[in-house]
């Protein structure tokens, strides 16, 4: 995301993100966004989606999500109940208008044509695929045709994961242990 924003002479500071999923990838997005001055204001699970206008930016909220998904990974409603946020049952957050970036981070083929049309109509500029192939081919082609949007496909976005795997192999062979900051520095 940062590289896409940099290419567009933009920054992550103050950006509002909508994501699907709150597993390892989604939770990592929430944490990294908060560290960089952005915030996840919408996140979806199998039971619906949560709208937290303040964002998932505190350790309390991030830790609660870890606990919540460990107890019951199929329901994100407990987050809304605990923090007094809006919960929309049985729906996805694709199409909400008060975000800057959409990031599907849950599962393959999560975003189909109907959702892609809602995303495009929302006026959002950035669509960043984080899960492996989260968008159906027809929906991805449709989004890429939108002149107002920057679309980053999963194969490009996830290249860092392959790089980190290589770094892990190097660490293991040399019996080293790098901090998250050191891994980030190695990637850049």
Stretches found by the model and what they are:
Residues 120-188:
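Adenosine-phosphate binding glycine-rich loop
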Residues 42-45, 87-89, 103-104, 128-130, ...:
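General beta-strand structural signal in soluble alpha/beta enzymes
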Residues 30, 76, 115-119, 139-143:
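Short amphipathic alpha-helical segments and helix-helix/interface helices
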Residues 1-98:
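Glycine-rich phosphate/diphosphate-binding loop of Rossmann-like nucleotide-binding domains
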Residues 25-29, 110-114, 135-137, 159-162:
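Short glycine/serine/threonine-rich phosphate/pyrophosphate-binding segments
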Residues 87-101, 109-126:
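Rossmann-fold NAD(P) dinucleotide-binding segment
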Residues 16, 39-42, 100-101, 125-127, ...:
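Structural motif
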């Amino acid at each position: 995301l940062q590289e896409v924003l940099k290419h567009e002479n933009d920054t992550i500071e103050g950006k509002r993100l909508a994501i699907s999923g709150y597993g390892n990838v989604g939770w990592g997005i929430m944490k990294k966004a908060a560290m960089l001055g952005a915030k996840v204001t919408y996140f979806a699970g199998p039971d619906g989606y949560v709208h937290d206008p303040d964002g998932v930016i505190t350790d309390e909220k991030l830790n609660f999500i870890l606990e919540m998904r460990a107890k019951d990974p199929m329901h994100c409603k407990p987050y809304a109940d605990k923090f007094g946020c809006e919960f929309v049952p049985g729906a996805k957050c694709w199409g909400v208008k008060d975000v800057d970036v959409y990031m599907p981070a849950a599962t393959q083929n999560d975003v189909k044509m109907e959702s892609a049309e809602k995303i495009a109509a929302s006026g959002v500029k950035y669509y960043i695929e984080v899960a492996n192939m989260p968008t159906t081919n027809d929906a991805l082609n449709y989004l890429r045709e939108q002149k107002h949007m920057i679309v980053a496909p999963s194969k490009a976005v996830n290249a860092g994961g392959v790089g980190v795997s290589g770094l892990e192999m190097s660490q293991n062979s040399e019996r080293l242990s790098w901090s998250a900051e050191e891994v980030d520095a190695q990637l850049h």
